[in-house]
């Protein structure tokens, strides 16, 4: 029964967190590049 509603939670979670981590790491990389 767990597998029936697990993708409906897991997919939006990855869809929101993964781009957020990507944008955050890119922002930190740009900021460090400007400082150096």
UniProtKB/Swiss-Prot annotation:
GO terms for cellular component: chloroplast thylakoid membrane; photosystem I. The chain crosses the membrane at residues 10-30. Keywords: Chloroplast, Membrane, Photosynthesis, Photosystem I, Plastid, Thylakoid, Transmembrane, Transmembrane helix. One of its GO terms (biological process) is photosynthesis. The keyword Chloroplast applies. It is a single-pass membrane protein. Its main location: plastid. It is found in: Plastid, Chloroplast thylakoid membrane. Belongs to the PsaI family. May help in the organization of the PsaL subunit. HAMAP family: PSI_PsaI. This is Photosystem I reaction center subunit VIII. The lineage of its organism: Eukaryota, Viridiplantae, Streptophyta, Embryophyta, Marchantiophyta.
């Amino acid at each position: 029964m767990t597998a029936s509603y697990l993708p409906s939670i897991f997919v939006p979670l990855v869809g929101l967190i993964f781009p957020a981590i990507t944008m955050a790491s890119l922002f930190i990389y740009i900021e460090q590049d400007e400082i150096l």
